[in-house]
């Protein structure tokens, strides 16, 4: 069991979780499923530009987010998958194809118009640039 150091740490965690709900709600205004697998049942709100590198407004900006299944979310956070400027899924050269096929299940080629806007494309450009050695 983890104990919090002080009330400031507790308040920070509560505010972060509160912001996460708002963040996911903003993403849900643009999409309702994983943009890779099409799953609606098990999706997570994923920051494109990670929380740790985002300023306060970017942390809750729904355009800095996409819905992904847990497997896709983990791969995206590690820079093992991303999306090109046309919304197509791209796989890292560091990710074995057999592992990719098992984890992704299948790229259903979901309509990516929800990410094809200037704001989200800029965040995706940041993601590709910061993981450029992977692609």
Task: For each feature predicted by the language model, list its residue ranges.
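A detector for short metal-coordination/catalytic motifs
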Residues: 18, 22, 29-30, 40-43, ...
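A short mid-domain helix/strand-loop element embedded in enzyme catalytic domains
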Residues: 1-25, 36-45
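Ligand/cofactor pocket segment of small-molecule handling proteins
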Residues: 33
């Amino acid at each position: 069991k983890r104990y919090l150091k002080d009330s400031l740490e507790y308040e920070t965690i509560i505010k972060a979780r509160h912001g996460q709900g708002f963040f996911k709600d903003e993403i849900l205004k643009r999409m309702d499923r994983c943009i890779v697998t099409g799953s609606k049942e098990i999706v997570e709100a994923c920051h494109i530009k990670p929380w740790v590198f985002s300023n306060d407004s970017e942390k809750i900006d729904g355009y800095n987010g996409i819905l992904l299944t847990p497997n896709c979310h983990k791969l995206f956070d590690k820079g093992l998958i991303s999306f090109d400027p046309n919304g197509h899924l791209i796989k890292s050269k560091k990710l074995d194809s057999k592992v990719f096929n098992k984890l992704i299940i299948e790229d259903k080629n979901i309509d990516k118009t929800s990410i094809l806007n200037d704001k989200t494309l800029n965040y995706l450009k940041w993601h590709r640039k910061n993981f450029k050695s992977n692609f």
